[in-house]
């Protein structure tokens, strides 16, 4: 991360801030809080007036979470820079994945937004409702699967980043036990746990992965508690699929290793940090805005990864040996040019059942519905949502 909106250097401060905000992807501060860029706000007439395109973003967490929402807001700023004078942007942070999301999104439309981004899975139904009543507005829903005549979906292949940091984890572990602090049991998160494990096993077949579910996207105290439980259970390298830096900070305190997730988190645990699996939403956001400005916007479902420069592993630690970095570079190149597939069979679940045959590669439809742990992941998978 080049610039931080909120820089927090100790978990104690971060946890206190989180408690004050009371926000997560499940129950952030009621109603959310609004912010706008210097280029302009969403204030305006109920219908989009002639002039710059008004682009509004609904965020599930705080822009200072150092992870998921920070990455989206960084991309929003990139849109402003790319289309200076042609667009104005605004955002509302801490918008719950609940009925209140509909109110916030309707308000964005009422204030003249011509393009609305909803940045979490739980906005799907509220966005569909608003889209049905605001046919003049284009809607973009992150991580969803339903579309409408004026609503399309987009996502990033975060499992590619998970696999790549798994390669590092498999080469760095001394105990052969890895840990993942997971948010909620939806296919996106299960994919990432499995990909992390497969990446680690590509370097060290003896590796096993233990998982703690916190059932929140952003809850630093719970994330830290889960991380400590994994460390106490023998894990010496941690990954997360949550939104704060608490997991990495916990690894730092314990003298163990961890990774940044969604954004570059190396400053939060400089000794523990091995690398960060990051998302760059700016290529897609720029495309979406350009589509609207050019009049070429159409309904489609987009899932971008390393190939499209949407996923990367950055800030690789000097502690990672050269041969391991070379292997990581090889995997990244293979993902970019299509010569390597993470989900090429045989893929076996934790019960020994072959779920992807040796001569097959899992389809995107298969990955979108994944509801099992691969061999090597310990524990029972909670009911997928």
Regions found by a protein language model. Give the residues of each.
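Bacterial signal peptide processing site
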Residues: 23-27
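Bacterial Sec-type N-terminal signal peptides, specifically the leucine/valine-rich hydrophobic h-region
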Residues: 18-20
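Repetitive helical segments and hydrophobic/amphipathic motifs
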Residues: 13-16, 34
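Bacterial N-terminal signal peptides that target proteins for export
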Residues: 1-12
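A residue-level marker of the well-folded mature domains of exported/periplasmic proteins
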Residues: 31, 39-385
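Short amphipathic alpha-helical "recognition" segments used for binding
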Residues: 6, 29-31
